[in-house]
Amino acid sequence: MPIDFHLSASQKGTYQAARSLARNLLMPARQTYLQHPPNSPLRFQSTQPTYAAAVSAGILKGQISPAHGGTGGTLIESAILVEECYSVEPSAALTIFATGLGLTPINLAAGPQHAEFLAPFLSGEGSPLASLVFSEPGGVANALEKGAPGFQTTARLEGDEWVINGEKMWATNCAGWDFKGCDLACVVCRDATTPLEEGQDPENKVMIILVTRADLDRNGEGSFEVLRHVATPGHTSVSGPHVRYTNVRVPTKNVLCPAGQGAKVAFGAFDGSAVLVGAMGVGLMRAAFDAALKFAKEDNRGGAVPLLERQAFADLLSGVKIQTEAARALTWKAAHAMENGPGDYDARRELALAAKVFCSEAAVKACTDVINAVGISAYDLQRPFSDLLNTAVVLPIFDGGNVGIRRRHLQQLMLKPTYDAWSSTYGSFP
């Protein structure tokens, strides 16, 4: 395709809808949840009306593939939506987008027999939450290397039921609005029906089981527990607690991915979300730049001219603008490549990983650069700068940490004998 950064009619529509959503729905949500103490679970619960309004507006249905009855568009359109929302109110936005991540394994792997699980998210009613329940308290970065024990959350087949036991952490939305379980959890776990044999690849035991709120209610009190609500410096209206499943029984029909197929689908979900984390980074960089630019035009720090006329300030600010443009270009290229190529899946995936790593780390640097430019006034909580940094700092370490997971995946791609560094740009040639 020719290189053209003009938005299509559909992309312009996405941008306009995202702009309206961010300013008219998400921004007021911030004023609501800030009325509650920092890191209080009430902050998350107070955003339920906002979430319900987003559902009514079709945002959840837009995160489901048309193949499954949704109205989902392209990955570039998703990136436009995420960037716009993150430039205005990232915390309330993450709850919405985390449901999209929770539904991604179904988008990737569901068959007709799984339609019932998607029904609540296609209705446009209520405030259903979905969650990709992946991370564990002890970490999972090395859990699937050969010789490792694999996931500590297990599922054992007993008759026509799977019995789930284990603890999970950081899975956004997994506890639901009342902290008794979300509407749909894609639980990534290890098949423990038979033991992992010495030398066996732990990936061969990874499966994904769908656990609904009805399943948890049927299992009764104590089957699902919130052990701790995690206090975080940013995204303070988001819920991603430490939870425990105890002898949760679900029917065999709830298996989305049997043992041996779960890891591929879970990592496939994170390949798509890598691009969207890139867009999150761009949104935060935008917000940091805009706030610093406004400050520089209005403030002179006791001098004779506005700060923007000072070379030191202008150099820092122009650097942030340049990095923001570069980050967006990489994000859009990765989004386009994931769905259109060129190159094989590994080449496309490399761009998604690069977008996640580059944009997340650039966002942190952008926030610190504008803080250095603004000076001590940036430390005032009435200004947005410290909040932007507290939000940005999680991007390199969540959704697959850059050091422990994302850069290791890049390393694995480069180690392959078939690695072609530039096929995602020029295609493959003999």
From Swiss-Prot:
InterPro entries cross-referenced by the UniProt entry: Acyl-CoA_Oxase/DH_mid-dom_sf (IPR046373), AcylCo_DH-like_C (IPR036250), AcylCo_DH/oxidase_C (IPR009075), AcylCoA_DH/ox_N (IPR013786), AcylCoA_DH/ox_N_sf (IPR037069), AcylCoA_DH/oxidase_NM_dom_sf (IPR009100)
Cofactors demanded by this protein: FAD
GO biological process: butyrate catabolic process; fatty acid beta-oxidation using acyl-CoA dehydrogenase
Record EC number: 1.7.3.1
Keywords: FAD, Flavoprotein, Nucleotide-binding, Oxidoreductase
Family matches, as Pfam families: Acyl-CoA_dh_1 (PF00441), Acyl-CoA_dh_N (PF02771)
Consequence the record notes for mutating residue 406 to K: Slightly decreases the catalytic activity
Description of how the protein assembles with itself and partners: Homotetramer.
Protein role: Nitroalkane oxidase (NAO) catalyzes the oxidation of nitroalkanes to the corresponding aldehydes or ketones with the release of nitrite and the consumption of molecular oxygen to yield hydrogen peroxide. NAO is unusual, since it catalyzes substrate oxidation by removing a substrate proton to form a carbanion intermediate. Prefers longer nitroalkanes, with 1-nitrohexane having the highest activity.
Entry's family note: Belongs to the acyl-CoA dehydrogenase family.
Official protein name in the record: Nitroalkane oxidase
